[in-house]
């Protein structure tokens, strides 16, 4: 990807009236039209394969799935938990990954794409789209000097949501491994029914586990491991 096609303007949109600090603004990336065409072509090629690549526990951005499905499952699990009897209950943890797109390390994204065994030329093109960008912040109608990011993927980039959910599958794998090693006790909606340890909602996730110190430590260690891997 030629660098001049990957120049990006960032404009700050206030999240609420009277925004007076940086965290109260949402950065929106204004990308080159040619760049958007290239990334949309990549997305169009990737989308048909996502149902096979992405776990059923992620329902956002995957063709044939609806985010409402996970909301219904979550409500049913919580309802079941309120009816359970026993000395030890279960817990639900909702996690909002702050600045999730901004913190992904580029080497981690490449490792995930290679893990999915995408064709090397496609991986090279995707990583060129991700890593060759230069950014200017649109401020009071002016465009200051450009700078080059060293990590993260851009908000409002057509490719970004799909890269993100592919990266989140690594967290799902870490959770499944904990469950298989009996280090994480998931929740069952019914006796003999499917066990649920987590559900994904794009960049949010809901975790289910037994409410004891052992599981709390396991949840924390799993999240720490993912943060260390992904940045």
Model-derived segments and spans:
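Nucleotidyl polymerases of mobile genetic elements and RNA viruses
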Residues: 1-231
